[in-house]
């Protein structure tokens, strides 16, 4: 089984990626 440290890092990385994607999408001018 993977250590708790890595297991805790996974759920934290997901929200960060989603937030970055949404931020880039908002910054991008809509056609």
Curated annotation (Swiss-Prot):
Keywords: Amino-acid biosynthesis, Aminotransferase, Cytoplasm, Pyridoxal phosphate, Transferase
Cofactor: pyridoxal 5'-phosphate
A GO biological process held by the record: glycerol biosynthetic process
Catalytic activity: L-aspartate + 2-oxoglutarate = oxaloacetate + L-glutamate; L-cysteine + 2-oxoglutarate = 2-oxo-3-sulfanylpropanoate + L-glutamate; (2S)-2-aminobutanoate + 2-oxoglutarate = 2-oxobutanoate + L-glutamate; 3-sulfino-L-alanine + 2-oxoglutarate = 3-sulfinopyruvate + L-glutamate
A single GO molecular function term of this UniProt record: L-aspartate:2-oxoglutarate aminotransferase activity
Gene Ontology cellular-component annotations: cytoplasm
E.C. number(s) listed in UniProt: 2.6.1.1, 2.6.1.3
Keyword rRNA-binding belongs to the record: no
Cellular localization per UniProt: Cytoplasm
Subunit structure: Homodimer.
Annotated family: Belongs to the class-I pyridoxal-phosphate-dependent aminotransferase family.
Other observations noted: In eukaryotes there are cytoplasmic, mitochondrial and chloroplastic isozymes.
Protein task: Biosynthesis of L-glutamate from L-aspartate or L-cysteine. Important regulator of levels of glutamate, the major excitatory neurotransmitter of the vertebrate central nervous system. Acts as a scavenger of glutamate in brain neuroprotection. The aspartate aminotransferase activity is involved in hepatic glucose synthesis during development and in adipocyte glyceroneogenesis. Using L-cysteine as substrate, regulates levels of mercaptopyruvate, an important source of hydrogen sulfide. Mercaptopyruvate is converted into H(2)S via the action of 3-mercaptopyruvate sulfurtransferase (3MST).
Protein name: Aspartate aminotransferase, cytoplasmic
Phylogenetic lineage: Eukaryota, Metazoa, Chordata, Craniata, Vertebrata
């Amino acid at each position: 089984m993977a250590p708790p440290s890595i297991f805790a890092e996974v759920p934290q990385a997901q929200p960060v990626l989603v937030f970055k994607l949404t931020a880039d999408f908002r910054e991008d001018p809509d056609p």
